[in-house]
């Protein structure tokens, strides 16, 4: 019987816990925080991207519920943590970087990523970007330079570019 899960051939027929444990041994030194305060658009895509680029963990700030269909099963292999209150957004041992096209942000293509520090990339809501409470936890900000007429990328796309 064929394994119908959306996993690479290497992981076909492995148990879910075994896949997650194997990935945990290979993860990179960054995590992702995505806001789920108002809408859950693109959360599934962000989780899939976190899996593709081996993020250490994914923090979902706000509501616990989101449409898991968008993850195509990737949420099963990730270290997901739901943070419901602003007080939980404390990461003293990490370097927190907001991803948004705001005035003080630095261009991602020339940005010098912190060396030897655990980085948390913070992504806001699809329609409003980073809220003031999320901006308050960030040490600095980066943006993705664009050349067309639209002002922003969707969060799923921006997270893939940033994690890559």
PLM feature spans:
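Post-transcriptional modification and biogenesis factors for structured RNAs
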Residues: 1-164
């Amino acid at each position: 019987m064929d394994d119908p899960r959306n996993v690479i051939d290497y992981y076909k027929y492995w148990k879910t816990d075994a896949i997650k444990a194997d990935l945990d041994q290979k993860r990179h030194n960054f995590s992702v925080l995505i806001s789920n305060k108002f809408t859950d658009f693109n959360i599934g895509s962000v989780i899939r991207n976190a899996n593709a680029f081996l993020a250490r963990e994914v923090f979902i700030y706000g509501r616990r519920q989101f449409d898991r269909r968008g993850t195509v099963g990737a949420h099963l292999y990730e270290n997901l943590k739901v943070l419901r209150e602003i007080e939980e957004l404390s990461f003293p041992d990490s370097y927190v970087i907001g991803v948004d096209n705001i005035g003080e942000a630095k261009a991602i293509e020339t940005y010098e990523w912190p060396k030897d520090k655990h980085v948390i990339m913070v992504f806001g809501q699809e329609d409003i970007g980073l809220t003031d409470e999320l901006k308050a936890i960030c040490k600095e900000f980066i943006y993705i330079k664009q050349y067309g007429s639209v002002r922003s990328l969707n969060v799923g796309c921006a997270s893939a570019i940033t994690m890559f």
